[in-house]
Amino acid sequence: MTSLQQRAELHRQIWAIANDVRGSVDGWDFKQYVLGALFYRFISENFSSYMEAGDESIHYAALDDSIITNDIKDDAIRTKGYFIYPSQLFCNVAAKANSNDRLNADLNSIFVAIESSAYGYPSEADIKGLFADFDTTSNRLGNTVKDKNSRLAAVLKGVEGLNLGNFNEHQIDLFGDAYEFLISNYAANAGKSGGEFFTPQHVSKLIAQLAMHGQTHVNKIYDPAAGSGSLLLQAKKHFDNHIIEEGFYGQEINHTTFNLARMNMFLHNINYDKFDIRLGNTLTEPHFGDEKPFDAIVSNPPYSVKWIGSDDPTLINDERFAPAGVLAPKSKADFAFVLHALNYLSAKGRAAIVCFPGIFYRGGAEQKIRQYLVDNNYVETVISLAPNLFFGTTIAVNILVLSKHKTDTKVQFIDASELFKKETNNNILTDAHIEQIMQVFASKEDVAHLTKSVTFETVVANDYNLSVSSYVEAKDNREIIDIAELNAELKTTVSKIDQLRKDIDAIVAEIEGCEVQK
């Protein structure tokens, strides 16, 4: 079986388990249990691997909790960020799950213990609340303790049965891949709400490559609307670890999604000291403002959401929004996210942000913000994508690429609306499509019906309209008509009609002649 076949089989198993164990509970409402169990297994195996340190004579899961000294525990927490006693490991709990009448209470105690092990250590903020959504007392699991334990046991046994290989034999990516697959499927089945926390991997790949283009190294990468962390992790997947020197940063407003993002970091083997995901409203309660600016920013913020805007008189003086001289409309926060990202961008940095297309041509405050961006030469490229690439919306969105190190004053426009492959319910970008977009992005050369670099003066003369269709002429797919050939065909047709009329007249005359003779 090839690696692709193995992965496909693993995905089939995971989704079958996710559907089997949830019973009559909606998959979206049950996701935290399956995802949480997978995470629990991962950190257990990860921790065991660390404690065994390659010594085959040590089997950490078989050790007695009592042999763990305070020094051993302290050293492990400083390195891994948390501590798990042998009895608390996933494999030991799952092995007895079916016969444990206190399973829900035991799981809750274990999760509390894992989180509390980080108290007072640098990892505390990264570990705190990780299992908050794995509510072992929820009625979603059943109405009685027995029902709850039965459902929890089914989840643990299902995840236990997944063939994720030997943790030490380079199978670590299987955990992260399995987690991303689950999140992707939950998002696809959740419709609009799913699109709010997960960016499809094929689009994430393009965004990450745009933000990281030409960089031999970046200090760190940031997503102000992190969701489940999928965009940040694409940067890790497609670039060597040493390129991103100080790690992965993000902020997320939804508590459940915030926990998913932190779990996602761990599951992709990013240690606690290499990521910092914060909870809160990016626009009104921003974190990381005191950090060094970011060399790479990626984001797929919510489209045209409402925000407090001008109702908060202090925001116009906020260093993120003040330079533009105007706030994004209260009913459409899109440009608030753009200005936030720009403020956090370093002098050598580049940001790639998914945007609702209306912000590129509407008037009012949005036009003034576009003027600020263009006049200060921050807009490198605007890319229009094909429709139906994202979960929960069929809208053809755009990607805005901002840069603080442009070498000319032109703005590049790329029409990628025809670059897609149709799949079951959504369109996708193939690797060939992404490569084609990146080639024209890098070269900045004009290609008919695909890309055009426009002078600053042209954009100004067009009232700072940044809509791709205003600059890249769409391909005319109408049939080209040869007028001379058409006239010749008409002449021939008319001649044939005239001859037919003569023939008909002759036949009619012959018939009438016959009737007269009678």
PLM regions: where:
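A conserved structural/catalytic subdomain of Rossmann-like adenosyl-cofactor enzymes
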Residues: 5, 285, 291-518
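Glycine-rich, flexible loop segments associated with nucleotide phosphate handling
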Residues: 174, 221, 331
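A structure-centric signal for secondary-structure junctions around beta-strands
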Residues: 34, 175, 218, 245, ...
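Generic marker of residues within folded, mature protein domains
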Residues: 168, 240-241, 267, 390, ...
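Conserved S-adenosyl-L-methionine
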Residues: 193-299, 304-306, 311-315, 320-325, ...
